[in-house]
């Protein structure tokens, strides 16, 4: 019920969602998406690191491996989500909007992406790191890994010590968060 309501509310007031790939990824579409990307980057965790040319190159060189889920209202693009198409998965990367609309983020980044992936025979959707709100929408917590090399031996030991504790806490958090998934728990199953 909640998901149906969210989806209805996201697409109210004449908002429509479109899944674009291949030749549908025009420069005008990339212009709009870049505006969304810049707006989100300027409001959240620091500065955006991709320039406008990057998106043109993405469209030129791998348009068939890109899915943009875009929303428009009254003929004007208002939000979008960038996904990369893998062999068996759809990978959500960036989101942005120039209109703040309830649940539109969930509609474009999760629900539309899941529908598109199912319709194209992909086994899963990887929605990216962070966000406890993903649990209610059926995304299992998964550990995200990274690798770093630290030149200074003293600093490396300090970071290694911290990361040992961090790994244990992340494992506990992942186990605890799994309990909140909206799936039925049956005896003998996860």
Residue ranges and their predicted role:
Residues 12, 34-37, 96, 112-113, ...:
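Generic signal for short, ordered secondary-structure residues
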Residues 38, 42-45, 59-63, 76, ...:
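Hydrophobic alpha-helix feature that most strongly marks membrane-spanning transmembrane helices
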Residues 159, 163-190:
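Acidic/histidine-enriched, glycine/proline-rich intrinsically disordered or flexible terminal extensions
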Residues 87-153, 160:
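Acyl-donor binding region in acyl/amide transferases
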Residues 15, 29, 66-69, 118, ...:
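Extended aliphatic helical segments
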Residues 29-30, 51-53, 114, 120-121, ...:
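Mixed-charge, polar/low-complexity N-terminal
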